[in-house]
Structures are given as C-alpha cells and as structure tokens.
C-alpha cells in the first residue's frame, strides 16, 4: 500500500517536561503535524495490516536551503529528485514522527515493522511518500 502525504516532513521533537505537573508533553506544532498525517492516512482508506511483519519504505522530500537553490547545476538534480540530503535533522527523527502518526491506522502496532528503507531527498515539492508491504515467511 502506498501513501503520499503532501505536507513538508517534520522531525520528531524532544519531549518537554512540565515541572509543576511532573508530566511529559509534546510541542503543539508536532502534535498538529501528527494529526495531519493521521488524517491523510485515514482519508486514504487503505486496509490496516493486523498482524505479521511488515516493511516500511519511506522517502522524505525536503525543500532545499538557499545555498543549494542558487547553484544552477543543482536545479536539474532537484527537478529529478536525486540530490540526497546529508544535513540535519536526522533521518531517524523523521522516521519516528511518521511511524508514530500512522501507528494503529495503516498497521496495528509499530512493533510489526521488521524492515526499513528510508531516504531524505531534496525536492522543490516537499512531501513524504510511504509504502508499507507485508513480509511473507518463506517455508
């Protein structure tokens, strides 16, 4: 099953702690991002994978910074979406945010994820493309 989330990817933020109530909480913009991703996942009406191992193939398309946009030879690479992003934020933080948001919607539990293919690519059209496939046991 394939899903495209047409909003710029956002990395998982660190939990914040409230000293008065002694509780951990998430920043509001992170909560809003996860709700938006969940909305797109539910609106896709894809069938949830209830059990068994799955593979997540995720590509995060990130809008490039100005220093990359200024170079003419990069323009063609950006249009082809083949210029990899090797800067912060870390790939695992993007992965955590997206898998938390679709947990319970596209699959029952994120513990089902047994294989991962993840990429960060610069693009003029920021979005996240997610493909979930069931892994079959070979007998």
Model-derived features: positions:
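Acidic, proline/glycine-enriched N-terminal capping motif
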Residues: 1-139
């Amino acid at each position: 099953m394939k899903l495209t989330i047409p909003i710029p990817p956002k990395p998982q933020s660190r939990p914040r702690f409230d000293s008065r109530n002694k509780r951990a909480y998430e920043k509001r913009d992170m909560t809003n991002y996860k709700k938006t991703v969940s909305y797109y996942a539910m609106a896709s009406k894809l069938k949830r994978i209830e059990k068994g191992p799955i593979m997540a193939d995720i590509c995060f398309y990130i809008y490039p910074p100005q220093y990359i946009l200024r170079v003419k030879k990069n323009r063609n690479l950006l249009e082809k979406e083949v210029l990899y992003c090797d800067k912060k934020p870390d790939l695992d933080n993007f992965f955590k945010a997206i898998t938390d948001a679709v947990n319970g919607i596209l699959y029952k539990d994120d513990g089902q994820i047994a294989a991962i293919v993840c990429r960060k690519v610069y693009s003029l059209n920021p979005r996240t493309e997610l493909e979930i496939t069931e892994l079959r046991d070979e007998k």
